[in-house]
Amino acid sequence: MGTTERESDPIAALILDRLSCTEYACSSLSRVNGGLMNFIYRGTLSRPLPDGATTVIVKHAEEYLSGIEGLSLSTYRSVIAAITLSFGYCVMDVESVQTNRYCVALDEVEVAVPRVYKFDAESNTQILEDITGYITVCEFLTSRCTQSTSPAFTTRLGFRLGSWLGGLHAWGEGRSPAEIIGGVEENQEAQDGSFDFFYGNPVRRVEQFPHLLGDCKEVLEQIRDRAAREQKSRTGEKFGFVHGDILSRKSVLIPGDSVTRDQHLRFVIIDWELSQYECHFRECGEVLGDLYLLKRFQDIDGAMSIIQGFLEGYPPLNEDAIFRTAIYLGLFLLANEVTLSTDYPKQQIEDFVILARDLVLAGWHKDRETLAKTVFGPVFFRAMN
């Protein structure tokens, strides 16, 4: 890296200097798109590692976010991610802890996480395995190859993702943070940020859409207050360890050639910085809402097939669990920044807000009839045990 390059990217220069005397010394770093919280680079190693790797992923944390100007966040998030990847969420004791890698075979699906080569606590830098040949679920759904993909395949993909996430939740249920990883309980900033997103944003949307949300402000506030009590006492229904950031556009990777060899599907789950203790149904609502955005605003039918499969693969939900999940799904949709977008017709945004409102109210009041009339009614009740 020359003088000009160092001046234009001082973070990369710092990383190169820190790694220069280690086995992870890099000849170059190239910025990887998609990082809002961290500075993410792909490093070309000066010498291959013993496992043959010639590149690594470098995640570096600062007290400010890389993609959001003016917003600060503790670098403790990098500690959470490193510990979680190395030890924490090992749902299954399958490989030696010395490899710093865990994976599991479940119904012809294998789930893995990147190997943590090194964590430099002093500089808040993680050196991770570079997962090559993989794409995000969102990239898969928006690619041309999806046009020739059957709904059965995308449903199976969702089923396997639901099975894995259900296994993660079941493993963490009833375990204290200390039993999983020593630091998850202290990830207070992540908890505060996600709490404000899920419960603060929907209340603020009332001011934006008073004609649509005015009558449900009290319900939104009651949901927020209940969540605050549950988070404080950690005694809410299905309250336990969650990944915290399962999004189709960033956290769930599948092989780029999955369509041609889908008999044995492999997931790689990344971005564990927001791991925390929360309601399992909230994480399910986030997964469903994130996928539905692809259907609603990009008209990607495969997203609904994944939703159906996810609910079929996740451990059976009773009626109360369906209602709780509907609440969190509606909250996620209301909280999402798309409600602030000017890129879509006003009526399209308002119809979206109405759907989110109906999901929240139907879930809160346990109104089966209203829930059944939404686009999620059929898939919810099909998944009910």
Swiss-Prot record:
Question: Which residues are listed for ATP binding in this entry?
Answer: N38, K59
Q: Which UniProt keywords apply?
A: ATP-binding, Kinase, Magnesium, Nucleotide-binding, Transferase
Please give the function described in this protein's UniProt entry. Phosphotransferase; part of the gene cluster that mediates the biosynthesis of the alkaloid (-)-FR901483, a potent immunosuppressant that shows efficacy in animal models and a probable inhibitor of purine nucleotide biosynthesis by targeting phosphoribosylpyrophosphate amidotransferase (PPAT). FrzJ catalyzes the last step of the pathway by phosphorylating the C4'-OH of dephospho-(-)-FR901483 to produce (-)-FR901483. The biosynthesis of (-)-FR901483 starts with the condensation of two L-tyrosines to yield (S,S)-dityrosyl-piperazine.
Q: What is this protein called?
A: Phosphotransferase FrzJ
- InterPro entries on file: Kinase-like_dom_sf (IPR011009)
Instruction: Name the gene that codes for it.
Output: FrzJ
Q: What Enzyme Commission number(s) apply to this enzyme?
A: 2.7.1.-
Subunit structure, per the record?
Monomer.
Q: Which family does it belong to?
A: Belongs to the methylthioribose kinase family.
Question: Which reaction does this enzyme catalyse, per its entry?
Answer: (1S,3S,6S,7S,8S,9S)-6-[(4-methoxyphenyl)methyl]-3-(methylamino)-5-azatricyclo[6.3.1.0(1,5)]dodecane-7,9-diol + ATP = (-)-FR901483 + ADP + 2 H(+)
Q: Where are the transmembrane segments?
A: none
Which interval of the chain is the signal sequence?
Answer: none
Residues of the active site are D245
The pathway entry for this protein reads as:
Secondary metabolite biosynthesis
